[in-house]
Regions:
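Selected transmembrane alpha-helices and immediately adjacent juxtamembrane segments
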Residues: 1-45, 132-182, 213
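Selective hydrophobic functional segments
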Residues: 52-105, 109-112, 194-244
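Transmembrane helix exit motif
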Residues: 64-74, 111-136, 228, 248-255
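Helix-coil boundary and interhelical linker segments in multi-pass alpha-helical membrane proteins
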Residues: 1-12, 41-49, 96-105, 202-210, ...
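Residues within membrane-spanning alpha-helices of integral membrane proteins
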Residues: 11, 55, 110-114, 118, ...
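Hydrophobic alpha-helical transmembrane segments in multi-pass integral membrane proteins
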Residues: 93, 148-158, 196-205, 249-255
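Membrane-interface alpha-helices at helix entry/exit sites of multi-pass transporters
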Residues: 45-54, 78-79, 175-186
Length: 255
């Protein structure tokens, strides 16, 4: 592996990139990869090492933002454990699948799907403000699980914008408002799904450990500050950031 010289400036830049990516992601309910991964590549890391470092950072989004959202009483622990434990096996399967089949052919299709969901969200203007959790029956739990499994597989396979899909699931299926949906996505996805991805790269020896303190510190601080701002600003602000992030993700997938 051709790792560039890890000077103090390089390590400082990785901290700043991790902070910015996780701050934005904590507001948008995802999208850290739109910022952090390209910056790590521009700094000269080989792709596999940049991806491993990105996964390490976003694995700590759930700890920083999740702690802040937990303090605010925004975590539904039933949904938290359901999201994490139901999705983890498919995240692992998606990660293994990625080594055998590229996701390039799927990206334009996923971009169109996300843009369609953005358009639907814009047409249904009141959904994001109403927090009226749906009473869950066994049939609804099974249906929600069937919807969640491909999202978890996608998170392990292609990864870009995975949080957008789960945020929509909370908004449209569980009938959460934007703040609660963002809190659940960042907490459950961050702690469970992203940590699994980070663990896979650690096991394979891809992680650049010299960058770990800066990446983790930036992720914890950025996600905590982002969650704090989101709680302060509320649903309307979070909805704008979420739809902006979703639109950018879709356009990048369509390239």
């Amino acid at each position: 592996m051709d790792i560039p010289d890890l000077s103090p400036g390089f390590i400082g830049a990785s901290f700043a990139a991790s902070f910015a990516a996780c701050f934005f992601s904590s507001l948008a309910g995802g999208g850290a990869g739109l910022i952090l991964l390209p910056i790590l590549l521009l700094l000269g890391l080989p792709f596999v090492n940049a991806l491993a470092c990105h996964k390490l950072a976003v694995g700590f989004i759930g700890l920083g933002s999740g702690y802040r959202y937990m303090k605010a009483g925004l975590i539904d622990w039933r949904i938290f454990w359901w999201t994490g434990l139901t999705g983890v096996p498919l995240v692992i399967f998606g990660t293994r699948f990625a080594s055998r089949l590229s996701g390039d052919a799927m990206r334009p299709i996923l971009g169109i799907i996300i843009l369609t969901m953005v358009a639907a969200a814009l047409l249904r203007r009141t959904d994001y403000q109403q927090h009226q959790p749906r009473p869950m029956t066994l049939r609804l739990w099974l249906l929600a699980s069937l919807l969640l499994l491909p999202m978890a597989f996608y998170s392990g396979w292609i990864t870009a914008g995975a949080g957008i899909f789960t945020t929509y699931l909370y908004l449209l299926f569980f009938r959460y408002d934007q703040l609660h949906a963002t809190a659940m996505t960042l907490s459950a996805n961050g702690i469970f799904w992203n940590m699994v991805g980070a663990g896979s790269h650690i096991f394979l020896g891809h992680t650049v450990w010299a960058l770990a303190p800066g990446l983790i510190g930036g992720a914890l601080l950025g996600s905590y500050c982002g969650a704090s701002l989101g709680i302060k600003k509320g649903n309307q602000f979070l909805r704008f950031i979420f739809l902006l992030s979703a639109s950018i993700t879709a356009l990048l997938l369509l390239r």
